[in-house]
UniProtKB/Swiss-Prot annotation:
The chain crosses the membrane at residues 83-103, 141-161, 173-195, 225-242, 245-265, 289-309. It is a multi-pass membrane protein. The gene is stas. Residues 43-68 have a biased composition (Low complexity). Residues 20-72 are annotated as: Disordered. Keywords: Membrane, Neurogenesis, Transmembrane, Transmembrane helix. This is Transmembrane protein 41 homolog. The lineage of its organism: Eukaryota, Metazoa, Ecdysozoa, Arthropoda, Hexapoda.
């Protein structure tokens, strides 16, 4: 009896102990057991951390421009700008026709060559025609070439290289160099204006992220923009039509753009003028640029960057 009772008592105690351990395990989850091993963060700091992260995310989203639909006013302004550009283009064509009308009387064989040259053969034939009338109609011939040059530059139409070679053939070096620099600067400035009128709104609408990145670079190197404009005009890294269209969109000032263009096109123009002196012997426009001339151009381009690089270096040292 006592033996059975002892056994019963032991069994009850064992059951009680097992139930107690099971209850303890249920009350303490694995996460709660492992929690003391990890660094404790006060609840108040955890509550403050989430709003900060949300604020940072909102700032990042606001800093990155997103493509948005154009408003009704923006669409109306864009259409109006396109109409103005179309009107300017038509007016330019009328001016070209006027130049053709005031030109001296040509025979049938000469009239077919009076056009904007598309290759070196066209440039040769046009040079022969203009050279024949240049002495008697000096300013008429010059005005016609200048108008054609500015027209090509304004509307980003290829062909200005052949006109540069043509000017080198027709006129003495100082006159030809000034005319090329003047026409390039004037035409590029007009293209800049047209892009500012229409392109700025469209480019920022379709490529907001790229536009924002380029604008930041321009702002970062604003003190050296003239040097960078010289470099771009001297080298074929970016086509001139792209520089003309993109500059107003990313915030390049007009006076720096125009002056940088006038001075920057001078070194390549010297090569084109020298090629014009041997125009009738050329078989391709690529003959105008030899490895030697390209090396000289690159040296001039690198030299134009040097003042800007030194200025930025001293600026960063001063800020540090």
């Amino acid at each position: 009896m006592s033996y059975c009772s002892g056994v019963a008592i032991s069994a009850d105690e064992g059951i009680t102990m097992r139930n107690g351990r099971a209850k303890a395990l249920q009350e303490h989850s694995p996460d709660q057991v492992a929690t003391p091993l990890l660094p404790q963060v006060p609840p108040q700091e955890q509550q403050d951390l989430n709003p900060q992260q949300q604020q940072q995310q909102q700032q990042q989203q606001q800093a990155t421009p997103q493509k948005q639909a154009m408003s009704a006013d923006e669409k109306k302004a864009t259409k109006k700008s396109l109409v103005i550009v179309a009107g300017i283009f038509v007016a330019s064509l009328v001016t070209m026709c006027y130049v053709y009308a005031i030109f001296p009387e040509l025979n049938a064989s000469e009239k077919q060559h009076l056009k904007i040259p598309r290759d070196i053969q066209d440039a040769k034939m046009l040079a022969k025609v203009l050279d024949r009338y240049k002495d008697m109609y000096y300013f008429e011939v010059m005005f016609g070439v200048v108008v054609a040059y500015v027209f090509l530059q304004t509307f980003a139409i290829p062909g200005s290289l052949f006109l540069s070679i043509l000017l080198g053939f027709l006129y003495k070096f100082p006159i030809a160099l000034f005319l090329i620099c003047f026409c390039s600067a004037l035409g590029a400035t007009l293209c800049y204006t047209l892009s500012n009128l229409v392109g700025r709104r469209l480019i920022r609408h379709f490529w907001p992220k790229k536009t924002s990145e380029w604008s930041k670079h321009v702002e970062e190197y604003r003190d050296s923009l003239f040097n960078y404009m010289l470099f771009l005009r001297m080298t074929p890294i970016l086509p001139n039509w792209f520089i003309n269209l993109a500059s107003p969109v990313i915030g390049v000032p007009l006076h720096i753009f125009a002056l940088g263009t006038f001075c920057g096109v001078a070194p390549p123009s010297v090569i084109a003028i020298q090629a014009g002196k041997t125009l009738q012997k050329m078989t391709s426009s690529s003959e105008a640029f030899s490895w030697t001339s390209m090396g000289i151009l690159m040296a001039c381009a690198c030299a134009s960057l040097l003042p800007g690089l030194l200025k930025n270096k001293f600026k960063h040292k001063k800020e540090a």
